[in-house]
């Protein structure tokens, strides 16, 4: 059999951009994009992407050139996930919530050939260019503005415009053949910068092959059927929308784009467009719960929600499902090209009590098909931990959907791939049924008197306490045990008023600590509760625990006697944003 050679017919490089061509041919009458009054079919989206790719090629943008974009969830942002790699270039989607200094640092590192930016961000663009030119007076970074597609715009002769590029593009048959035939599936398709919750963000290089396999694994793991209606509550800049930018094309789905994630907008779009799927971080659950919920009982099925980014407490999942959403938990990393674990529902779970079902659903789940293996290993011995749901270790993985590495950072790449695995830095356990469950980030583990305390486990208990909207638990200093848990809590609106706020919070803190003592081993219970109006979050909605740790460092843990008695005293309460 060794004499059977690879050829053009049986050795085609894998790339998710082929999903676009297939969608235009297989679903010609299907709506691809909805944005306000704008509607596109799949053939129209295909044509627009081909024209944009042709224009980029005419600007001498090609293989391995970086194309940066700062834009919200709009048709342009979606189209660029195809058009940029079709031109042979590498898409660099940038978090729109970053400030000019952070974006300038990314551009300085990525060195893009061109920058696309949403028109309403023009002041931000000018500030970014000023920062870049202050270091390099010879800088010549072309900027293309993306206007609101639903509204007329005036484009000066000196200004470049996204829609003009599409109109000018001339995709000849020769160019079209080139666009969908990449030479090497290991070539980069996307450059994604990590969220930077721990330190300076790193540039993650994703390959065509990795994106293709991760996309297929995601739509299979989520059991996404043909022609879904997908609501873009998750930013497309966040790990390419967890690969569903390409996944919706693979399924011939409809992308409902929305700029602002608010409860009224979400519920309006669900009703108006009969949305079937959406992704979000758990903080969006609180937006849904605080908003005026929609009666979804008349629908033929629930809205399927894939959530990740941080472990959602079972109590929170239960509340959201009662609104008419069917929640599936996933776990992933930018370095792994999106989700790598899906909590696949098992039929035997249907016979369990609701609370137990929610506990199982809150786990991270089983590995995607695109990975060779996921394991939980002792960081010191590199041996697999027992599958007992108790013994903690680091979550590691390997497979063809893993990143190529960090751009211009060989040291970080080496550390990430040490011991032949992608090391996640997340601490978890494996249950007897093979499901992985995150217990914490390694840096968030609290070590009290030599005992490891999972902040996530403590948070899960606090979330079950009435009127708790959000919580985060971090370490605070303790004179005897070194560290002890400190809980930061956001209460539901209206839980306290200005007149008796102080007294109520004192009572709340006392009751909450006592509740934890009834449901957790005493060494795991918070010695301090700090009430906030809002938890600090980064642009992706992840809670910024380093900021909370900074506050906790200045607090004093009480001894065991005072924890039990909880005498009346002023309660720490921080207002506004951190």
Swiss-Prot record:
Belongs to the ATP-dependent AMP-binding enzyme family. It holds the Pfam family AMP-binding_C. A motif (Microbody targeting signal) lies at residues 576-578. One of its GO terms (cellular component) is peroxisome. Expressed at low levels in leaves. It is found in: Peroxisome. The keyword Ligase applies. It is an enzyme of class 6 (ligase). InterPro entries: AMP-bd_C, AMP-bd_C_sf, AMP-dep_synth/lig_dom, ANL_N_sf. May act as an acid--thiol ligase that activates carboxylic acids by forming acyl-CoAs. It comes from the Eukaryota. This is Probable acyl-activating enzyme 12, peroxisomal. The gene is AAE12. One of its GO terms (molecular function) is ligase activity. Keywords: Fatty acid metabolism, Ligase, Lipid metabolism, Peroxisome. One of its GO terms (biological process) is fatty acid metabolic process. Its EC number is 6.2.1.-. Transmembrane segments: none annotated. Disulfide bonds: none annotated.
């Amino acid at each position: 059999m060794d004499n059977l050679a690879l050829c053009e017919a049986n050795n085609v490089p894998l790339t998710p951009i082929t999903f676009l061509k297939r969608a235009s041919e297989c679903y010609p009458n299907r709506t691809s994009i909805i944005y306000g009054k704008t509607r596109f079919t799949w053939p129209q989206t295909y044509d627009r992407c081909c024209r944009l790719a042709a224009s980029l090629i005419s600007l001498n943008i090609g293989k391995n050139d970086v194309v940066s974009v700062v834009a919200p969830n709009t048709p342009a942002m979606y189209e660029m996930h195809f058009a940029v790699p079709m031109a042979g270039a590498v898409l660099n989607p940038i978090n729109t919530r970053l400030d000019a200094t952070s974006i300038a640092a990314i551009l300085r590192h990525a060195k893009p050939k061109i920058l696309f930016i949403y028109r309403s961000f023009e002041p931000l663009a000018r500030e970014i260019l000023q920062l870049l030119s202050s270091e390099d007076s010879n800088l010549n970074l072309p900027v293309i503005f993306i206007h609101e597609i639903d509204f007329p715009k005036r484009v000066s002769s000196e200004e470049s415009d996204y829609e003009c590029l599409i109109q000018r593009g001339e995709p000849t048959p020769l160019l079209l053949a080139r666009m969908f035939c990449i030479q090497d599936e290991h070539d980069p398709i996307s450059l994604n910068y990590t969220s930077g919750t721990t330190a300076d963000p790193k540039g993650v290089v994703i390959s065509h092959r990795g994106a293709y396999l991760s996309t297929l694994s995601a739509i299979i793991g989520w059991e996404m059927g043909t022609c879904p209606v997908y609501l873009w509550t998750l930013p497309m800049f966040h790990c390419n929308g967890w690969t569903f930018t390409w996944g919706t094309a693979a399924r011939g789905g409809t992308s409902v784009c929305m700029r602002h994630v608010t409860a009224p907008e979400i519920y309006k779009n669900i009703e108006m467009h009969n949305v079937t799927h959406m992704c979000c971080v758990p903080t969006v659950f609180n937006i849904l719960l605080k908003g005026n919920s929609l009666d979804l009982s008349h629908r033929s099925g629930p809205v399927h929600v894939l959530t990740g980014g941080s472990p959602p407490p079972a109590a929170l999942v239960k509340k959201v499902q009662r609104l008419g959403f069917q929640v599936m938990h996933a776990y992933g990393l930018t370095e792994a090209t999106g989700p790598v674990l899906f909590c696949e529902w098992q039929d035997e779970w249907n016979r369990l009590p609701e609370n137990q079902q929610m506990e199982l659903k809150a786990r991270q789940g089983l590995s995607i098909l695109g990975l060779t293996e996921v394991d939980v290993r002792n960081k010191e011995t590199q041996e697999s931990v027992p599958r007992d749901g108790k013994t903690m270790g680091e979550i590691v993985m390997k497979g063809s959907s893993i990143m190529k590495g960090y751009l211009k950072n060989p040291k970080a790449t080496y550390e990430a791939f040490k011991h032949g695995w992608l090391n996640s830095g997340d601490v978890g356990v494996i249950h007897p049924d093979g499901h992985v469950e995150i217990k914490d980030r390694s840096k968030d583990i609290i070590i009290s008197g030599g005992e490891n305390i999972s902040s996530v486990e403590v948070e899960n208990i606090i979330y079950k306490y009435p009127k708790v909207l959000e919580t985060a638990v971090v370490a605070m200093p303790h004179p005897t045990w070194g560290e002890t848990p400190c809980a930061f809590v956001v209460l539901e609106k209206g839980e306290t008023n200005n007149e008796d706020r102080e007294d109520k919070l004192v009572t709340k803190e006392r009751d909450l600590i006592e509740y934890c003592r009834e449901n957790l081993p005493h060494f795991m219970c918070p010695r301090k509760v700090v009430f906030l109006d809002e938890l600090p979050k980064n642009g992706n909605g992840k809670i910024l625990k380093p900021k909370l740790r900074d506050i906790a460092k200045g607090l004093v843990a009480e001894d065991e006697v005072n924890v039990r008695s909880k005498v009346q005293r002023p309660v720490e309460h921080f207002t506004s944003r951190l």
